[in-house]
Amino acid sequence: MRATRPLLFFILLLSIITHLSAQTRNPFYEPMSGKDRWVDSVFKKLNKKEKIAQMFFIRAHTDKGKAYEDSIQTLIHNSRVGGLVFFQGGPIRQAVLTNSYQSVSLVPLLVAMDAEWGISMRLDSTIQYPYQMTLGAIQNNDLIYQMGKEIGKEFKMLGMHLNFAPVVDINNNPDNPVIGYRSFGDNKYNVTAKGLAYMRGLQDQGILVSIKHFPGHGDTNVDSHQALPVLNFTKERLDSLELYPFRELIKQGASGVMIAHMNIPALDPTKNLPSTLSQPIVTSLLKGELGFKGLAITDAMEMKGVVKFFPDGEADVRAVIAGNDIIELSENTKRAIKLVKKAIKTGRITRERINQSVKKILEAKYWAGLNNYHPIDTTNLLRDLNLAEALSLNQHLTDASITVLHSDSLLKALDPKKRTAIISLGVTELTNFQKDLKLKIPNSMLFLMSKIGSATDMNAMLKEVKKYDQVIMAIHDYRKRPQSSLDYNTPLKIFIAELAQLNTITCVFANPYTIAGIPGIENSKSVLVTYQNNDEAQRSVVKILTGQMPAMGKLPVTINSFYKFGDGLDYFPEPKPVLGKTSY
């Protein structure tokens, strides 16, 4: 069965392309009525320095106080930058500041955010959609498309135009310190299908994307925020694996690609040269060989992976030379603009090179509606960012991701009338999962154990739990990057192995790689994986355990010899008599 999975996912990819292609807006670089006229009129009004500044996007927070906000407004007014990237803060504060910043900008700003799981990645009081690893388990990719559209709506409510998402890195290294849960998984076909659905949802809603991190950051063991990763793979390997999702999404009209800070000798042998600064990678490979016509966007230019070997603004200059259109988050934007201007005078950069990028940026602004800019209306904004239909979709996404491994024998046989032990591990207080499940199975007892509990307490609990007819064990871990480990003490790991040998259903509320660090989990009667430890996941599992919904998720990654990519039962429950109260 496993030998046929790549073929099945390829067929799935073709089907999703066919399904979505008829629904998409044309990319910004395709002909549009009135676009050339507006672009030319704006372009002609810009002086040489202002044209350079259009390529630079600056950082903006909404939680750093008035002095900081005034400094950003001054930089926008004086330097004439092309856009900004919002980070931490609140939605109302961001909307008010966006209106203020736009009011002093010569050309309407292209407003971006790194919002892989929605704007809650940066803003409080908003909906957090599932991580991409969770989405990788979903079999109905239309749900991911709908999520992309919902996130697109949120962007438009906040006057934003560009999402630095989706991540299309193939996470084939479980110890990856920077991607991991941000990836759809370790299968190139699944990553591509999911990435395409997310991209289409955003672009159909009128939001630009930036698929990342080109040419593929999934098999690294160095965080490019801190140092320069080196990818020592052949061109053939890169072409067949890492580049695959980028190639396919570019064919389908990706509006932007973010270039990673990595040294890749097979693509450019220059020592210590990040891919962001490589003309062979950005211009020859991305724009030439892959035919990309959208916005080439650097990863943050303040990261150590790019400035370590090219300090004092040299990285900014080289990023322009390499062929990037948008230079985001320079260490010093004013200095960078001056250095690029100097590089033009000395012949390192041609004026035509700048003009190409500026016109492309203006085309993207036109596509995003900035030719007809309107300030954000903050009336009922917080309510509109948390509508019932969006919250419902968020729960449906989690519902669709839950994966049943090993067997569904006890799931089908679970009897709400029998004495049931409901155990949560790795916590210090009763979980919502336990409280909700007890409402449905009143003939139950709740137990918990912290991740540093004593062996004496565990032995006493084990003796008590053995008196029960059936056991539901929940393993809780909030870590995003477990790297194939479970950070429980040794006695608790032994305790898990002993509990698994009882008549036990094990529920893993954690990143799937955590399973590799859970001893004896394969001895459980059934294993449920949720990918995250949040309220949505706990609600989903309660519904599955009590026969209220099926479980259809598949593992998006290979964990170990027991559990591999694509594993997961299609579990359809038989209706169970629910004795307790209904909380849904």
Predicted regions and their residues:
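Preference for extracellular/luminal or secreted protein segments
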Residues: 22-58, 62-74, 288, 310-584
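Loop/turn elements at helix/coil->beta-strand transitions in domains of secreted/extracellular proteins
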Residues: 48-54, 79-84, 105-110, 156-162, ...
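Short glycine-enriched loops at secondary-structure junctions
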Residues: 61-64, 113-121, 161-171, 211-217, ...
